[in-house]
Amino acid sequence: SKGNMAVLNMLNTKYFITPKGQAQQNPGAMGNAWFVDTINIVPNADAEIAGLNEFNPATTAIVDARFSKQIIDSLDNTAANIVLIVYKPNYLQYNSSSTNDGIAIFSEIYYSKGWNAYVDNKLTPHFRANYVLRGMQVPAGNHTIEFKFEPPSYFTSEIVAYVSSIILLLLLGFVSYTEFR
């Protein structure tokens, strides 16, 4: 393949279509989430993209310096695991188990607006890693990790829709009452 296999693997690309139209399984696909041992902080997004050319996504994450306040020194987490339990368009749930605090990388596109991360129902910051993915500091132990799409605009429009429905029902009731009276 002429593509960057490390990037395809971190994006959890499970299959390739060959020039003959055959599906070929990618044995290097990273899965939905994993822990890394090394964090490479780079000065900007350009350096983050450049770093994707020569790195091992199984062990290393490349992070823009803007997100460095959310990063701990990652520890050896070779025995750690993280498993996707629930996958919906606006909700993701993972179970993690690790003996040390660590950094988990999620093979989900990072989008800061509206997405909130929770560890054991506690709002937890997450950051962009490897230019396009999500990363998060995960404490040692067994935890439930959730990503929820909770944009304020959605809740505002939901309230407006409910209030509008109530007003419409009251108006219809009033019109019906005055017509049949």
Language-model region placement:
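Active-site-proximal, structured, solvent-exposed surfaces of multi-pass membrane proteins
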Residues: 8, 56-181
